[in-house]
């Protein structure tokens, strides 16, 4: 039996690309380079993206189909060659080359206002005239779409330099991306660690962030695979830790670990004191006084700022209007002061 290209194409036409209903030939995935020598054959398959999740299974199915239709005496020379239309994502360490400073916003535990700090710090930096991007890396509990009042936004992709790039949403002078834009807000995100990390890498490496002075990453509370993904994927400038005193040590120790080695830019004491609206000059230290200052001295890191408990912070966050937008308020001034302290670091 003689082999010729049409027999190979007929075999490949029985393999369908998942989710499209088209076979490999119809989908234009078989390059016109089929090479045959006796019973030896080699050819190339074309995929849209280098990260195509079906690449391995499709290649295996193509190989099996040829052997099934043309006989096991057929030898596929080497591996089936794979080519991609979309350019490959840059290597780790070369991502975001146009970003000057990459800062993680972290906390040792949840419920300390880390995301509030991240959102308002981003807005405050933008008000100071800097180009700012904010990535909501809290994959399992994204909050930035609500805090910026862009819950209905759906980022789209554009072809840039041969790659499909996600265009970040812009609000209050901040470029913003969150997994919350791509999932149903009423459904739990039931992903294993690897899936979450891959989604995060896409939001970092497959997005058109452009030139930025500051790229802030709102990390999940505690320590997790997401934190490791970020520090292994990006050249971090440093981290800002929102303080819940006992757990802040864990966050600091994670970043200063020899395997991670990300500088701590400083601490932010959120909920430092309570000031009621009717008594704006009063401060009630309901969680104790100077705890963050003592921790900063103990850990030899700066105390970048103190944010009071004020009803408007929560209310404005729920409305999607960060308090840092209004520099005439006590909280607005507090976040602008924090932004200036971060810049000095």
Regions found by a protein language model. Name each.
Residues 1-34, 69:
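N-proximal, solvent-exposed amphipathic alpha-helical segments enriched in charged/polar residues
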Residues 12, 30, 66, 99, ...:
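Residue-level signature of catalytic and energy-coupling elements of molecular machines
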Residues 26-29, 37-41, 47-106:
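Extreme N-terminal, non-catalytic leader segments
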Residues 59-60, 213-306, 312-315:
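Conserved catalytic-core segment of NTP-binding enzymes
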Residues 101-139, 248, 258, 267:
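Walker A/P-loop phosphate-binding motif and the immediately C-terminal alpha-helix
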Residues 125-191, 197:
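Phosphate-binding loop that captures ATP/GTP phosphates
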Residues 155-158, 179-194, 201-229, 234:
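Switch II (G3) loop of P-loop NTPases
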Residues 319-329:
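C-terminal boundary of histidine-terminating zinc-finger modules
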């Amino acid at each position: 039996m003689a082999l010729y290209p049409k027999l190979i194409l007929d075999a490949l036409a029985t393999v369908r690309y998942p989710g499209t209903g088209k076979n490999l030939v119809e989908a234009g995935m078989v390059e016109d380079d089929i090479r045959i020598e006796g019973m030896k054959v080699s050819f190339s398959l074309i995929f849209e993206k280098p990260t195509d999740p079906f690449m391995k299974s499709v290649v295996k199915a193509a190989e099996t189909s040829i052997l099934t239709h043309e006989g096991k005496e057929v030898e596929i020379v080497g591996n089936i060659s794979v080519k991609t239309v979309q350019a490959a994502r840059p290597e780790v360490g070369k991502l975001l080359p146009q970003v000057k400073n990459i800062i993680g916003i972290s906390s040792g535990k949840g419920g300390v206002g880390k995301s509030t700090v991240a959102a308002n710090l981003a807005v405050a930096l933008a008000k100071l005239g800097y180009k700012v991007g904010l990535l909501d890396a809290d994959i399992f509990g994204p909050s930035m779409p609500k805090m910026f009042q862009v819950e209905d936004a759906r980022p789209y992709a554009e072809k840039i330099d041969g790659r499909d790039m996600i265009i970040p949403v812009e609000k209050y002078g901040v470029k913003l991306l969150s997994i919350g834009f791509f999932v149903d807000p009423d459904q739990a995100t039931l992903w294993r660690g690897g899936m979450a990390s891959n989604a995060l890498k896409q939001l970092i490496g497959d997005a058109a962030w452009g030139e930025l002075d500051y790229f802030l990453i709102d990390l999940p509370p505690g320590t997790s695979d997401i934190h490791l993904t970020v520090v292994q994927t990006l050249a971090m400038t440093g981290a800002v830790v929102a303080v819940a005193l006992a757990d802040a040590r864990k966050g600091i120790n994670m970043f200063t670990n020899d395997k991670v080695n990300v500088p701590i830019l400083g601490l932010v004491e959120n909920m430092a004191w309570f000031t009621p609206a009717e008594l704006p000059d009063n401060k009630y230290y309901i969680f104790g006084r100077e705890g963050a200052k003592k921790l900063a001295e103990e850990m030899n890191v700066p105390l970048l700022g103190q944010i009071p408990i004020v009803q408007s912070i929560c209310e404005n966050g729920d409305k999607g209007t960060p308090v840092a937008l209004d520099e005439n308020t006590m909280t607005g001034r507090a976040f602008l002061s924090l932004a200036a302290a971060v810049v000095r670091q």
